[in-house]
């Protein structure tokens, strides 16, 4: 797949993409606590799509909005329709005097985990040992759980979304609020990664809650180039403490 769509010398990309992961959610906290104590599941009693932000997550969104409003005026905003991303978007835009239109975009929603939703590695091994083996054999990038998605599945829908940006939002400044896997998939597509590059960056560090990733259009190459990745300097006071 390629995302470098060009018609002659005319710019077809937005001037910049600012991609933000949602703030800390109730699900994030439950998952981290389950990992610490070795639990097999981290249920919250809510569907993934309905999971809200924590108070810390709301504060992260507020601080992110204060930071972005001092550096950008956006022409358009796209948010995953999940509750935690919508709340993050609302928290960010509260800092803006001029609020651009917000589009709830299903193509940038969270990866679908299928039957493994809400399970830790220990839980998968206990409840679905054959899936645990298949997951190890196929690898994190290609593995598709029953009823769920692989990373390439997510890439297909994000690639379609990028096509919309090149068609309708050229020369615009665009804010995108989404999820950690989707942030990495944007990088995989825009920087033309293969599996090895994706896994390498994924292993190096987690995409932080409310971190900012920025691409800017380069006139010489006619492409969006990475300006910064996973930047969370504006969140020093609101980062969750390491266990």
Each model region followed by its residue ranges:
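Loop-to-helix element that buttresses phosphate recognition and phosphoryl-transfer chemistry
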Residues: 29-92, 144-159
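Short, well-ordered beta-to-alpha junction loops that form the rim of enzyme active sites
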Residues: 22-23, 79-83, 107, 147, ...
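Active-site-adjacent alpha-helix immediately C-terminal to a catalytic or transition-state-stabilizing loop
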Residues: 14-17, 86, 160-223
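Phosphate-coordination/substrate-recognition cap region in phosphate-metabolizing enzymes
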Residues: 2-18, 27, 59-133, 196, ...
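A short C-terminal helix-loop "cap" of Rossmann-like NAD(P)-dependent dehydrogenase/epimerase domains
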Residues: 38-43, 102, 129-138
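Short N-terminal binding/cap micro-motifs at the start of the first secondary-structure element
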Residues: 26-30, 237
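Acidic, His/Gly-rich catalytic cores of divalent-metal-dependent hydrolytic chemistry
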Residues: 223-243
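Residue-level signal for well-ordered alpha-helical positions
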Residues: 91-92, 127, 139, 189-190, ...
């Amino acid at each position: 797949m390629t995302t470098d769509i060009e018609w002659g010398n005319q710019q077809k990309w937005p001037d910049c993409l600012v991609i933000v992961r949602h703030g800390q959610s109730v699900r994030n906290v439950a998952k981290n606590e389950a990992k610490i104590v070795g639990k097999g599941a981290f249920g919250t009693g809510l569907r993934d799509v309905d999971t809200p932000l924590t108070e810390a997550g709301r504060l992260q969104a507020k601080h992110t909005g204060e930071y972005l409003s001092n550096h950008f005026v956006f022409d358009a905003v796209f948010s995953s329709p999940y509750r935690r991303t919508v709340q993050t978007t609302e928290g960010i835009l509260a800092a803006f005097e001029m609020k651009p239109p917000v589009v709830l975009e299903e193509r940038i929603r969270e990866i679908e985990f299928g039957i493994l939703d809400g399970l830790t590695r220990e839980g998968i091994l206990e409840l679905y040992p054959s899936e645990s083996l298949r997951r190890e054999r196929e690898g994190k990038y290609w593995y598709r759980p029953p009823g769920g998605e692989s990373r390439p599945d997510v890439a297909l829908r994000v690639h379609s979304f990028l096509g919309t940006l090149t068609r309708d939002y050229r020369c615009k400044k665009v804010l995108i609020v989404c999820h950690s896997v989707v942030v990495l998939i944007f990088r995989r597509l825009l920087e033309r990664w293969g599996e090895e590059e994706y896994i390498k960056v994924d292993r190096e560090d987690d995409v932080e809650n409310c971190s900012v990733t920025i691409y800017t259009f380069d006139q010489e190459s006619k492409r969006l180039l990475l300006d910064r990745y996973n930047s969370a300097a504006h969140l020093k006071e609101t980062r969750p403490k390491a266990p």
